[in-house]
């Protein structure tokens, strides 16, 4: 078996006008596909470690040194993007009561959470991701990572992710990342967030 590129759960143009079809096509078919190909190439060198990227990236020191950085970059890139696609929706969804309560407890209000997440996404220098994660105590926190690093490697469980690499927004938003972040909040799939939150509390 090999890691497979997942299909998008909607059409390439389904998120317009917030995320354009050309960006989605390039992002999924080229960028994500490259991470998958490179992760598979690395894993082929060490079949003995298996292909469970979540397990491997939860403890990167167990990854053989000669493929460690490749799996951090490309395995992380695959996991991050596979999650990202699930967290976007053409249909409007609402924050569930459970997630809203957790957000209010952690941040004070939804607006305060949105401000914290926006700040994390805006101030992430260069390429990376902004995250809403569940920590080891089951509490929510906002964080960001560089490049394709995943919060899984820090013992955190991601439930919301925003790709702030320029390839995710530059065709439509040019250098104005804040406008892309604002648009992201229009297409979040809060049903997926709720599912991931429930799973994070039980696993």
From Swiss-Prot:
InterPro entries: Mn/Fe_SOD, Mn/Fe_SOD_BS, Mn/Fe_SOD_C, Mn/Fe_SOD_N, Mn/Fe_SOD_N_sf, SOD_C_sf
Annotated keywords: Iron, Manganese, Metal-binding, Oxidoreductase
One GO MF term: metal ion binding
Gene3D superfamilies (alphabetical): Fe,Mn superoxide dismutase (SOD) domain (1.10.287.990), Iron/manganese superoxide dismutase, C-terminal domain (3.55.40.20)
Record's catalysed reaction(s): 2 superoxide + 2 H(+) = H2O2 + O2
Enzyme nomenclature, EC number: 1.15.1.1
Protein residues bound to Mn(2+): 27, 81, 163, 167
One Gene Ontology cellular component annotation held by this UniProt entry: cytoplasm
Family: Belongs to the iron/manganese superoxide dismutase family.
PANTHER family from the UniProt entry: 37S RIBOSOMAL PROTEIN S26, MITOCHONDRIAL, SMALL RIBOSOMAL SUBUNIT PROTEIN MS42
The protein's role, per its UniProt record: Destroys superoxide anion radicals which are normally produced within the cells and which are toxic to biological systems. Catalyzes the dismutation of superoxide anion radicals into O2 and H2O2 by successive reduction and oxidation of the transition metal ion at the active site.
Protein name per the record: Superoxide dismutase [Mn/Fe]
